[in-house]
């Protein structure tokens, strides 16, 4: 089984920025990748949902329309206009880095940005990293490790074993007679994820986290549970 966080960075960015639209889309199950494909296609470049995935969340990490086709670049401009809360949060982070030469994430981790200054265009130096670090730091530096530990603890009485993790995916070797039990563990963890974060960091997330599971005879040939 592969248990993979659904849109982890986007959910974390929505929480950290408290972007109302992003939070609404997450709770309603809005298909953001199909929307990205539509924006690019409407700009004149036919794009599938799969092709759009590489663009959907790229602006979260400082990517811009530079080096993209005109139709693709239109999405990057659209992202900033659509998610005003995320854009405002990015600006706030930039101001913090210029003023204090560091930024602090919600879990208390600090990222030093010495010699950060304002460029002639108004943007701070190191802006890509300034946008990126708080999201990646909380998502994969704080959330994923404690969930891995919790999953390992819940599997401990069983013969199924957590064997690997890659970024925000967890790979479980399931004993043939324990498939349903492991599925139930993942389902129960989905009910508890936000509480797990609070118990470890005293951070109360108002955006739901979600694990999506796939099962198969090997890591390549899997199907959604």
What spans do the regions from the language model cover?
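Conserved catalytic core of nucleotide polymerization and phosphodiester-bond processing enzymes
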Residues: 1-225
């Amino acid at each position: 089984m592969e248990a993979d966080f659904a849109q982890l960075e986007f959910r974390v960015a929505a929480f950290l920025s408290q972007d109302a639209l992003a939070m609404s889309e997450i709770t309603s199950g809005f298909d953001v990748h199909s929307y990205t494909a539509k924006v690019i296609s409407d700009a004149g470049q036919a794009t599938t949902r799969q092709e759009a995935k590489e663009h959907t969340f790229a602006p979260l990490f400082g990517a811009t329309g530079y080096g993209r086709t005109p139709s693709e670049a239109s999405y990057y401009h659209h992202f900033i206009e659509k998610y005003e809360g995320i854009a405002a949060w990015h600006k706030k982070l930039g101001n913090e880095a210029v003023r204090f030469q560091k930024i602090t994430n919600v879990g208390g981790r600090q990222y030093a940005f010495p010699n950060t200054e304002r460029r002639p265009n108004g943007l701070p130096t190191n802006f890509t990293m300034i946008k990126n670090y708080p999201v990646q730091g909380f998502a994969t530096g704080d959330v994923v490790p404690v969930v891995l530990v919790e999953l390992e603890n819940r599997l401990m009485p069983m013969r199924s074993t957590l064997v690997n993790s890659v970024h925000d995916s967890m790979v479980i070797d399931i004993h043939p007679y324990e498939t349903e039990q492991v599925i139930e563990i993942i389902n129960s963890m989905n009910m508890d994820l936000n509480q797990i974060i609070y118990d470890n960091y005293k951070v109360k997330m108002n955006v739901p986290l979600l694990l999506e599971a796939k099962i198969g005879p090997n890591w390549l040939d899997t199907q959604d549970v």
